[in-house]
């Protein structure tokens, strides 16, 4: 489940919504009807939903949802259905998105009338409330009614051509803030195998012989007076035994010291 911080940073605002449900075997008609009901307050106009097969055999769904009013929500779970969470994107080119959805479907469901958009200026953008609005009012109108990053930049270019040509980077920055890109959910190209071929050994089993131990060959490089591998093995064995004995002696002294300290703290008989 998404954290509260991720929910606060989520924002979807578009009249054309592209949804992908990974690993979802549900019927496209059932998903479409539920999505239609979910966006009833924004007046849905069209939906197409198709089921496709992954290369690993699992099913997934694609859906394009068009509404009369832009869907505005900060709820990242708004399109969750039957426990399936979709990847939510703004359809920048509805024609291409629809073609992509219908490329190789196993099952398809459509409802309503598809609304193609050949340019970002098409659509039912309301007129300006004033006859001669100032620059701030025009910009506020664009921010309120643009439904995608592309449409926002196109409207800015139309209303402020000089500013668009000289300050495009600032408008692109504001467009990215208004319509942030949504990261696609990662799907591993290597599905789990049977039996599991992943290596589950503890890293300690590798560290001990490979990092913490000195090989005879490395010891010979550090000791010019050591000429054979047998001599190196003998020296390393002696040092290992000596180190082990010293550690045991230290543990023994520490244990004895602790006992003696405890005995020294015992209370004597009352006088």
UniProtKB/Swiss-Prot annotation:
Polar residues bias (residue ranges): 244-264
Ranges where the record places region Disordered: 244-271
Binding residues annotated for a divalent metal cation, in chain numbering: 52, 60, 62, 104
Cofactor binding note from Swiss-Prot or TrEMBL: Divalent metal cations, possibly Mg(2+) or Mn(2+).
Motif (RCR-2): 60-62
UniProt EC number: 3.1.21.-
Active site: 100 (for dna cleavage activity)
Domain text: There are 3 rolling circle replication (RCR) motifs. RCR-2 may be involved in metal coordination. RCR-3 is required for phosphodiester bond cleavage for initiation of RCR.
Stated role: Implicated in enhancement of V-sense gene expression. Acts a an inhibitor of C-sense gene transcription.
Assigned protein family: Belongs to the geminiviridae Rep protein family.
Name listed for the protein in its UniProt record: Replication-associated protein A
């Amino acid at each position: 489940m998404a954290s509260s911080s991720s929910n606060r940073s989520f924002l979807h605002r578009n009249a054309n919504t592209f949804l992908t449900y990974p690993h979802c075997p549900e019927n496209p008609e059932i998903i479409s009807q539920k999505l239609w009901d979910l966006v009833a307050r924004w007046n849905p106009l069209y939906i197409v939903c198709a089921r496709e097969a992954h290369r690993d055999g699992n099913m997934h769904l694609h859906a394009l949802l068009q509404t009369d009013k832009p869907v505005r929500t900060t709820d990242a779970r708004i399109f969750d259905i039957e426990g399936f969470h979709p990847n939510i994107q703004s359809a920048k080119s509805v024609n291409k998105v629809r073609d992509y959805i219908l490329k190789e479907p196993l099952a398809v469901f459509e409802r309503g009338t598809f609304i193609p958009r050949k340019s970002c200026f098409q659509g039912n953008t309301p007129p300006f409330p004033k006859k001669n609005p100032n620059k701030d009012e025009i910009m506020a109108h664009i921010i309120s009614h643009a439904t995608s990053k592309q449409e926002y930049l196109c409207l800015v270019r139309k209303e402020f051509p000089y500013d668009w040509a000289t300050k495009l980077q600032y408008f692109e920055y504001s467009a990215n803030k208004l319509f942030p890109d949504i990261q696609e959910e990662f799907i591993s190209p290597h599905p789990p195998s049977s039996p599991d071929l992943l290596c589950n050994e503890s890293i300690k089993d590798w560290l001990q012989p490979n990092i913490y131990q000195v090989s005879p060959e490395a010891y010979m490089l550090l000791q010019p007076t050591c000429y054979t591998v047998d001599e190196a093995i003998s020296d390393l064995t002696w040092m290992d035994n000596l180190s082990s004995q010293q550690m045991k002696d230290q543990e023994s002294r520490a244990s004895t010291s602790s006992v003696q300290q405890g005995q020294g703290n015992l209370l004597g008989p009352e006088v």
